[in-house]
A protein has these predicted regions:
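Acidic/glycine-rich phosphate/pyrophosphate-binding loops and surrounding catalytic core
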Residues: 2-224, 228, 240-245, 254, ...
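Active-site T/S-Asp motif of two-component receiver
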Residues: 231
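Glycine/alanine-rich phosphate-binding loops at beta-alpha junctions
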Residues: 234
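Short acidic, glycine/proline-enriched helix-loop-strand junctions
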Residues: 249-258, 303-311
Length: 319
C-alpha cells in the first residue's frame, strides 16, 4: 500500500468530488455511444460476470469513476483491493475487482471505465513515486501538480494526484489568482499594479500568487501583498540562495509573509537538486503530463469456462 499523505491521510478522497461529477461520467458514456450499440445487440442482455485484471504495477486510483460508469449501466462492482493500494507487483494479472450485470452493459462500459481508471492510476503512481523520491532526499513540505491538465478530464487527473499523496494545486482560475509573466506585462510590467488589481477584485478570500523570474521580483511581489511567490525556472543552487534570502527577510513558518513555490522543468531526474527547508511547495507537471497509464483489462467470464477453455489471458485490442 502507498504511504498515506495529503487528503488520503485524513479521509476518503471520493468525499471531495462535487455533485456534478456523476453527470460528467454520463457524458463519457454518451460520447462513446451516441447512436446504436451494434456490439451490444449481438451479445444481448444475459447476466454475466467480468474480472478486472491489473496487468502492470501501480497505485489504484479512480475507483469512484469506474464504479459510476457501471452503476449508470445497472451493473455492480466488487473490489478486492482498496483505492491507494499497489497492485500488479507480485502477480502479473492480479484480479482486483469483479463486475456483474447484463453482458451488453459490461461491454458498453468497459472502455470508458478502463480509460478513467488507467489514467487516474497512472497519475497516482507517478505522484507517489515523485513524492517518495523527495521524502528520501529530506524534503518535508508540499509536492503539487499543476493546471496543465487534459480539457474535460481535470477532475480525474486532480483526483489521481490526491490519491498519490500530492496537493492538486488550484483547481481552476477561480480558485486562486496566479499572475504570470503575461499578466505582469499586460500591466505595463508593474507587479504592484497587478497585485493591487487582483486583491481589489478577488477580495480577502482568494489568494494571489505571482510568478517571479528573479529574487528581486519575488521581493517586490511580497512587498506588494502577494500570498505566494513562484520561483520559476531557477537552477537548484539559485533556488536555495533565493529562498533563504526571502525567508530571512520576510519570515518563516507561521510568521512568514508569503509562501515560496518552486516550479519549471522539475522531474524525477532533477527534483532532488532543489530540495531545501525554505521551499514550501514544489510543483511539477511531470506528475500528470506524459505519464504512463497503469494497464488494466476487463475480461468477461465465459458461461461455461470448462467448455470454452480457460478464461482469456487479459490481452485485448486498444480500441
Amino acid at each position: 500500500m502507498a504511504s498515506k499523505e495529503g487528503a488520503p491521510a485524513h479521509g476518503n478522497p471520493a468525499h471531495l468530488l462535487p455533485p456534478s461529477w456523476r453527470k460528467t461520467v454520463g457524458l463519457w458514456l454518451e460520447e462513446d455511444t451516441p447512436s446504436f450499440d451494434y456490439g451490444g445487440f449481438v451479445v444481448g442482455d444475459g447476466p454475466a460476470e467480468a474480472r478486472l485484471l491489473a496487468k502492470s504495477a501501480g497505485i489504484v486510483a479512480g475507483v469512484p469513476f469506474f464504479d459510476e460508469v457501471f452503476k449508470q449501466l445497472d451493473c455492480t462492482v466488487e473490489w478486492h483491493v482498496k483505492e491507494g493500494d499497489e497492485v500488479g507487483v507480485q502477480e502479473k494479472k492480479q484480479h482486483v475487482a469483479t463486475v456483474k450485470g447484463p453482458v451488453r452493459c459490461l461491454l458498453l462500459g468497459e472502455r470508458v471505465a478502463l480509460n478513467a481508471l488507467a489514467r487516474c492510476s497512472g497519475i497516482a503512481t507517478k505522484a507517489h513515486a515523485l513524492l517518495s523520491l523527495l521524502r528520501q532526499a529530506g524534503y518535508k513540505n508540499t509536492l503539487a501538480g499543476t493546471r496543465k491538465t487534459t480539457p474535460g478530464f481535470r477532475l480525474v487527473e486532480k483526483y489521481g494526484m490526491l490519491v498519490g499523496g500530492c496537493d492538486p494545486h488550484r483547481q481552476d482560475l477561480s480558485a486562486m489568482t496566479m499572475l504570470k509573466d503575461n499578466h505582469i506585462w499586460a500591466c505595463s510590467g508593474s507587479i504592484p499594479t497587478a497585485v493591487a488589481a487582483a486583491k481589489a477584485s478577488a477580495g480577502f478570500a482568494v489568494k494571489v500568487e505571482v510568478e517571479c523570474q528573479s529574487e528581486e521580483e519575488a521581493n517586490t511581489a511580497i512587498e506588494a501583498g502577494a500570498d505566494v511567490v513562484m520561483l520559476d525556472n531557477f537552477t537548484g543552487d539559485g533556488v536555495k540562495v533565493a529562498s533563504k534570502s526571502l525567508k530571512d527577510r520576510w519570515g518563516r513558518g507561521t510568521n512568514a509573509r508569503a509562501l515560496i513555490e518552486v516550479s519549471g522543468g522539475l522531474n524525477e531526474d532533477n527534483v532532488s537538486d532543489y530540495v531545501c527547508d525554505d521551499i514550501d511547495i514544489i510543483s511539477s507537471s511531470s506528475i500528470h503530463q506524459g505519464v504512463k497509464h497503469v494497464d488494466f483489462s476487463l475480461k468477461v467470464i465465459p458461461k461455461d469456462a470448462n467448455a470454452h477453455g480457460k478464461m482469456g489471458d487479459g490481452e485485448s485490442a486498444d480500441t
